Amino acid sequence: MDRRNFLRTASSFALLAAGATTGVSRVFAKTPSFSLTGNQSDENTPNMGDTMEYRKLGGLDVSAIGLGCLPMVGYYGGKYDKKDMIALIRRAYDKGVTFFDTAEVYGPYTSEEWVGEALAPFRDKVKIGTKFGFGVEEKQPTAINSRPDHIRRAVEGSLKRLRTDHIDLLYQHRVDPKVPMEDVAGTVKDLMQEGKVLHWGLSEASARSIRRAHTVCPLSAVQSEYAIWWREPETKIFPMLEEFGIGFVPYCPLGRAFLTGVIDENSRFYEGDRRWNLPQFTPEALKHNMP
């Protein structure tokens, strides 16, 4: 595959809500609306239609557009009703989405619980990606922790919350500088041999970390932020993924809703919205970056 086709293919994996979809994110100036009135298929089969494309991600068959389930637990401000979010997840499935992204730290735990409940009726028809790597069980959700014993406990917890006997795609959420990557990869390899994990990947990892991990246990995917306004993965990450045949899953492909047109220079975010802390979303930056 040449570089142009690789970039085109890679960029089509869009975890929409992982960086704030227009349907879930909240801004003062222009708050989009969404409908949750879709009817679920009686056959528990997604509506493939003519609009959804499907891809190979390592050995996984996934929809080209996935649903990231971080904003549902208020990461971008606001509080959302469990019933509505389960309906949203199932509506995405009705529209052909078969790839869902979550993590133990989202909530913490809440996102996995909602995803597990929402997808239970058609679990065998979807692929779920989740993540380990933060000190959630120690009540330190911002502390990085990828010790082997912690990984095992995190996976057992995720399996329970997701109501499943296996995780389709398990990511290390962030690289732990205190734990050798070889130890992390070796632990996940053991979990794969036990059938609890089918594929694994890294999130926001350097090229060096990717190489070290892949040497011990081949990676299926790497997840990083990637959008028109953030193309850093093109420099070192994409060439390595192409070399090793590893898939790429971008998060925030819509620039945390900035690229959707629902945000303008007058937008101000709700209290609790994490975008307040990002330099791209200061009033000065919004004004400067408007087309």
Give residue ranges: language-model regions.
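Alpha-helix N-cap and loop-to-helix initiation/capping positions
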Residues: Y80-D84, T110, W114, T142-H150, ...
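Conserved, mostly hydrophobic/aromatic
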Residues: L57, L67, M85, F100, ...
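Beta/alpha (TIM)-barrel catalytic core signal, keyed to glycine-rich beta->alpha loops juxtaposed to Asp/Glu
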Residues: R4-N5, V175, V179-P291
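Short, well-ordered coil/turn segments that N-cap beta-strands
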Residues: V62-I65, G96-T98, R123-V126, T164-D168, ...
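Short, acidic/polar
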Residues: K79-A92, R147-K160, R208
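N-terminal binding-site loop/beta-alpha segment at the start of enzyme catalytic domains
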Residues: D2-K127
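Active-site groove signature of glycoside hydrolases
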Residues: K160-P177
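A short acidic, helix-capping loop that chelates divalent metal ions and anchors anionic groups
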Residues: V73-Y76, G135-P141
